[in-house]
Each structure stands twice: as C-alpha cells, then as structure tokens.
Curated annotation (Swiss-Prot):
Gene3D superfamilies: 1.20.5.170, 2.60.120.920, Immunoglobulins. One of its GO terms (molecular function) is microtubule binding. This is Fibronectin type III and SPRY domain-containing protein 1. It comes from the Eukaryota. May be involved in microtubule organization and stabilization. It is found in: Cytoplasm, Cytoskeleton, Microtubule organizing center, Centrosome; Nucleus; Cytoplasm; Cleavage furrow. It comes from Bos taurus (Bovine). Residues 4-99 form a coiled coil.
Amino acid sequence: MEDQKEALRKIITTLAVKNEEIQSFIYSLKQMLLNVEANSAKVQEDLEAEFQSLFSLLEELKEGMLMKIKQDRASRTYELQNQLAACTRALESSEELLETANQTLLATDSKDFPQAAKQIKDGVTMAPAFRLSLKAKVSDNMSHLMVDFAQERRMLQALTFLPVPSAPVIDLTESLVADNCVTLVWRMPDEDNKIDHFVLEYRRTNFEGPPRLKEDQPWMVIEGIRQTEYTLTGLKFDMKYMNFRVKACNKAVSGEFSEPVTLETPAFMFRLDASTSHQNLRVDDLSVEWDAMGGKVQDIKAREKDGKGRTASPVNSPARGTPSPKRMPSGRGGRDRFTAESYTVLGDTLIDGGEHYWEVRYEPDSKAFGVGVAYRSLGRFEQLGKTAASWCLHVNNWLQVSFTAKHANKAKMLDAPVPDCLGVHCDFHQGLLSFYNGRTKQLLHTFKAKFTQPLLPAFTVWCGSFHVTTGLQVPSSVRCLQKRGSATSSSNTSLT
C-alpha cells in the first residue's frame, strides 16, 4: 500500500512538473503570437515607408525632368517664334517692295522713272529680307530629353527583402599580435553592398585550438565597425590565447558569426609572492606598500629573545653598508620571508628561458626603491644587488639622491633622469638584463651575464610603494634597440 502511494506521489510530482512546463510553453507561444503581430506590423510599416520614399523620389525626379522638358520647349518656342515674326515682317516688306517695283515698271511716265528706280534699288539694298538668316536658330529635335528606364526597371523588379549577410572569413595571415595589440582582418566571401557594419567579439582563454562552447570568460563585444579590420589596443595578456569571431549586419538583420579563431598572446604573467615579502611590506596582488608597523611585534619578540635593544637600520643606510651579520651563509631553503634590511619581495614565476618584459611604477616620494631579478637562492637577509645572486636598478631618495645599477655589491651611477616607470627586459638565453624608461622606452642600462639558475622578478622598497604591470609583450622598440646593439654599447662589464 505504501509503495503504491509513493509511486502515485512520484506520478503526481512528474505530472505537476510536466504541467508547469506546458504552461510555461503555452505562455511562450502566446508571447510569440503577440510578437508576430507586433513585428509584422512594424515591418509592414517599414515596407510602406520605404515604398513611399521611392514613390516620393520618383515623383520628385519626374517633376524635375518634366520641368526640364518644359523649359527646353519654352526656350525653343521663344526662339522660333521670334525668328518667325522677323521672317514675316521681312516677307511683308519684300512683298511691298516687289509691288512697288512692278508698278514702277508698268508706269508710262518716263520722266519720274529714274528717280523711282533708284529708290526701289536703295530699298532692296536695305530690305530686311536680304539681311535675314534663313536657317532656324534652334532644332526641333528633342531626342536629348528622351529616357530609357529599362535598367532601372529591372532594378526595381529585383527589389526584395534584405538577405541575411554571409559569415565573414577571418584572415589569419593578415592578422597580427604585437605590442599588446591585436589587429584582426577579415573579408566577405561574396560582395554585399547592403552591409552596414560589423560586430567583433573576443574573449581570453588558456586553451589552444578551436574555441570551446563553455568558457569562464565572457565574450567582449565591439559594435559599429565600418571596415573589414579592427585593432584592439592597450590589452593585458593575462591568459595564453584569445578567441575572436565576427559577424556582418545590414540595416535589418545580422548574419552568422564567422568561424571562431584562436590567436596566441604570449606575454610574461606573474604575481608577487607575498610569502617571500618582508614583514614591513604589505602585498596586494601586484601592488606593494611600505608598512612601518608591519613587523613591529616580531621585532620586539626578536629583541627580547636576542637581548638586543637596537632596531634595524634602513636599507642602504651609511651605517649599514655591509650585509646584516645575521645573514645565513646558505640560500633560502624554503619560502622564508626576507627580513632585517632586505625589504624585498619576489615574483612567483621562474624565468628559465626566452624573452620577458614587465614594468613597475613606484611612488616618486619613496625613500628607496629597486627592481631587477634574483636567483631563487637569494638569502633572506641579502639585499638586491649586493650579492652575485641578484641584479637591479636602485633609486635612493634618502639623504642623497642616487640612481645606480647594482650587482655583486658593486654599483654604477647612471647619468639619466630618474623615470617614475621602469621597464625590465630579460633575455635569459642571451644573458641580457636591460632596463628602460617605461614611458619613452629609452635604454637606461644593460647587464650582461651568464645566468646559471632560473630567475625571479625581484623588488625592494623602503618608505614608499610601487605597482607592477605584467601580461606585457616585449615592445617592438625594445627588440629594435637590442638588435641594433644598443644594449651592448650601454652595458657595464664591471657589474656582470
């Protein structure tokens, strides 16, 4: 009995669900019926408006052409009537002269004949008939105003509803990825002069090959493109690839999307490894800010344990020119934080080959700031540039302003304005580490070295802050400088 009731309950539940689905579908059908009526009325109204526009245009053209015929007729009529009137007057004068001549010839009075003959001769000389052109001033031919609308009639007969545009074809051979920009080029398989604009959609992905149906990243949309190419600028390549697709639109409808394509967007992506940072550095994703109170509690405990009453001196303090005596002879074996005067934080991604580029903007009021690379073995007490395991550019605004390149506890003063944005270019296999003005791409300094271990991006700051920008490609201008040998001419072998 209970089993039957349970089975009946399941049937009731199934029926209820099905009824709800049917009701929802009925509502959808009713809504579609309303939409059909509304959309039909709209397209009918649009059609009538278009034809009315054609009628108005044809009527306007007709009136203009009729006016041209009337004006031409009036002009010719005027000329011909004037010429006709002149000829009529000349004929009347000539007939009068002829009659006078005949009468004179028949006259019997020979005494007056010479005088009369002379007058007739003078009258003939001055007669309008002999000064009149007997050629019509205008033609009666109106063929230049004839029309033949056979071609236009065929065009009108071909009027129909707008066709759905074909799907564009993306041309990968003409498309380009460079300088954190993507230029996408496409073409239409067939000529279509009804296309009004194109719509481009793109999204980021970490998957190579054809785009997948389901992606975590949404499609980004760019509308109103009038040409068959478009350039996306200022991109951050924080994923390995990008998917693209394009569709064409006319006034009424859009066509199908093109076959999606995937372009590789190679760039160096990393995050700051907060587990390595000095306790006085507050790390937030790619931003770092000096926090004077960050390690206060730990410092107090350390002083109580060691029985020492002094605190650590600032980085690069004249009183602390040598590494801390607490520095361990061996490199860091785990993920220990930097400590003492090494106000350092590392990136979380190793560089073991290829070319990579990133930029960092630091607060100009920072008392000290450094950027470069380091081996993973850099000791937790070691400062950037003061051992053979790190290379950096260092800005010091404390007591005395300096801008130096540092490696293996050696420094070279740089004769260049200190930019607020520094670009770092690392060519691992070539053993080149170059620093640039991030805004102008002016080369500041290049280290030449033989890297024996994978590198990590490294940063240091004291009483200041900075922000790192990753996902950048090696700029074309940087590649050109390196190819021209500018890097070699700017290097300092004493620091390598």
